[in-house]
Regions:
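S-adenosyl-L-methionine-dependent methyltransferase catalytic core, i.e., the SAM/SAH-binding region
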Residues: 1-313
Length: 313
């Protein structure tokens, strides 16, 4: 049984509250019964909140585990009295770089909003066997889609120069060469195929001294970005979203590190048909950060699709 009666056609809220949820919803300026694309569905927290505000939602996620959450949401919609859940909610397993094709095939040609919550989800971090978390032991995998080369494959096959370049470019790691040399030396002794072994190799290579966070954090970020081509996918998704949006529609993006945020900032600036809604990105308040430490790094940028000028070709 559900706690509290669900309003007709509105499913119950998710137990896990996403980062900066209310600010995301406000920035999307939801118009009831218009379509919004939740391009990073995850466990469905944003989608449930969007449905509760009256939006219709096309949800996309490449993570194979997301489909079970989508099915649970469909079941909740039926319980809440929606005879045909596809009128309110559609889920497509796909990479958000394929947003244009997905939206066309799903019958959502000009959505009123697109939401991207970037990076690795708490759902992925909480499962040690996915290989995303340096604090949880598991196979060194890191694939969001479950297909293609793993992080263990990269760590096994790349030479020191390639590893150092990835750590420097995608992890913004100051000690990239030192860590890369340590990885090459360690793998000659025994395979680096678990998260705990990689984390220990990086920790041992790191210079002594006070640290704000775990020494392996930037290395794991860099490998995850390479494994999933995250920045290439983001650029593709931003272009597709801006092309798709109806005039007056909103594009809202949550980024968690400077590489992502820079790409979003430049995408908004470089498109004549996008108007940024804030001069600087919005950040989570102290209370939210205290309740959810992941919110500390979040930066929210939002833009509105402008109508074409009259007389424009």
């Amino acid at each position: 049984p559900h706690a509290g009666g669900a309003e007709a056609g509105r499913p119950r809220p998710a137990a896990h509250v996403p980062v900066m949820l209310e600010r995301c919803l406000d920035a999307l300026a939801i118009v009831p019964d218009t379509w919004v694309v939740d391009a990073t569905f995850g466990a469905g927290g944003h989608t449930r909140a969007l449905l509760a505000r009256g939006a219709r939602v096309l949800a996309i996620d490449q993570d194979p585990h997301a489909a079970a959450h989508a099915e649970a949401l469909r079941a909740d919609l039926r319980i809440a009295g929606v005879a045909d859940p596809s009128e309110r909610f559609r889920f497509v397993p796909a990479n958000f770089r394929d947003l244009a094709q997905v939206a066309a095939e799903a019958g959502v040609p000009a959505p009123h909003g697109v939401l991207l919550d970037l990076g690795v989800s708490s759902m992925q971090l909480d499962e040690g066997d996915r290989g995303f978390a340096f604090r949880r032991d598991g196979p060194l995998d890191m694939r969001m889609s479950g297909s293609g080369p793993t992080a263990a494959d990269l760590v096994r096959d790349a030479d020191a120069d390639e590893l150092a370049a990835w750590l420097h470019r995608y992890g913004e790691e100051r000690h990239s060469r030192r860590i890369a040399r340590a990885i090459v030396a360690a793998r000659a002794e025994a395979p680096i195929d678990t998260t705990s072994r990689l984390a220990e190799v990086v920790r041992a290579a790191y210079p002594a001294g006070p640290r704000r966070d775990h020494p392996a954090r930037r290395t794991f970020q860099a490998l995850r970005i390479v494994v999933n081509d995250e920045l290439g996918a983001l650029q593709g998704a931003l272009t597709a979203a801006a092309d798709l949006l109806a005039p007056g529609g909103r594009l809202v993006v949550l980024a968690y590190h400077s590489l992502e945020d820079r790409i979003v900032k430049h995408a908004f600036r470089d498109r004549a048909d996008l108007r940024a809604l804030h001069k600087r990105p919005l950040e989570a308040g102290d209370a939210e950060v205290a309740a959810n430490p992941r919110a500390r790094a979040a930066k929210l940028r939002a833009a509105e699709k402008t109508a074409p000028e009259k007389g424009a070709a």
